[in-house]
């Protein structure tokens, strides 16, 4: 084995010289230069500095403006709530431990950080699944006269939390575990060991199949069918141009969210699977650190995509920030009027960009 396994940790360095120490008790500066830990702490501070206000603003503006409280936007709000969980429960912990160079908060802190990171990522993934299914049902109409209502949105929200919890909770109760990874200042699922009594192998397979591959298959199926339906509708002119444009714009926004999720999380998933299937092989602490910390940037991109691509939300946000006035009233107002008209003819009653 090209690493050192201890009680609730695995460090990717053989302890031939006796230098390896528990990541819960000693700084891990023998793994990488101390400046790297300072850089990680600064990176996490930046994510908190941007992630908290932008997600809180998304939540506040949507609750403040009644016209934004549409069923589909409930799912988008769910993404903001999940991101806030990651920022407050995970990022603050990681920033603090990075500043100390080891997981100074101990096992409890590791469980908290690992849980919130996993929960937030899974809520985001399953929210994208619900959005993809909604787009498929509304645009492709496999169910005639279907309208995505508030009840459907609430069921979708409950579904995302149940599925995310089914992935994030088991390591807290003995099916696998959360341990420090990479530079030992952030925590994740134990892909590294076959520790007795934790059944890591079965959990990792369960997680990859049920909480990564199956959701992605559903998303790709829905958008594959959606692409065909949009082309057919455009060719046949079955619906008004306004309705088609509204549906296309909503679908485009959700597709970009899916692509951004894949860009952020696939490197982490790929490295984790490699480590799991090559347990005991040699790799450095940065091998997992880079994709793990890159994945954390997902807390920023969803609200940014929403703000950039949803003119109605952007108008409401500017109005809120400018004390009820929009200095870009002519431009944003025209866009909002156009989009409100498009929304009124959309069978999903959403607010597209």
From Swiss-Prot:
Function noted in UniProt: Photoreceptor required for image-forming vision at low light intensity. While most salt water fish species use retinal as chromophore, most freshwater fish use 3-dehydroretinal, or a mixture of retinal and 3-dehydroretinal. Light-induced isomerization of 11-cis to all-trans retinal triggers a conformational change that activates signaling via G-proteins. Subsequent receptor phosphorylation mediates displacement of the bound G-protein alpha subunit by arrestin and terminates signaling.
Mod. after translation: Phosphorylated on some or all of the serine and threonine residues present in the C-terminal region. Contains one covalently linked retinal chromophore.
Lipid attachment site numbers (S-palmitoyl cysteine): 322-323
Residue ranges that the UniProt entry lists as topological domain Extracellular: 1-36, 97-110, 174-202, 275-286
Comp. bias regions, Low complexity: 334-353
Chain positions covered by the region annotation Disordered: 330-353
Organism the protein comes from: Chelon labrosus (Thicklip grey mullet)
Cytoplasmic side: 62-73, 134-152, 225-252, 309-353
Site (Plays an important role in the conformation switch to the active conformation): 113
Residues carrying sugar: 2, 15, 200
Annotated family: Belongs to the G-protein coupled receptor 1 family. Opsin subfamily.
Chain ranges for the short sequence motif 'Ionic lock' involved in activated form stabilization as given in the UniProt record: 134-136
GO terms under cellular component: membrane; photoreceptor disc membrane; plasma membrane
Record's subcellular location: Membrane; Cell projection, Cilium, Photoreceptor outer segment
The protein, known as: Rhodopsin
InterPro entries to which the protein is assigned, alphabetical: GPCR_opsins, GPCR_Rhodpsn, GPCR_Rhodpsn_7TM, Opsin, Retinal_BS, Rhodopsin, Rhodopsin_N
GO MF, any single term: G protein-coupled photoreceptor activity
Membrane topology: Multi-pass membrane protein
Membrane spanning stretches: 37-61, 74-96, 111-133, 153-173, 203-224, 253-274, 287-308
Keyword Transmembrane helix included in the entry's annotation: yes
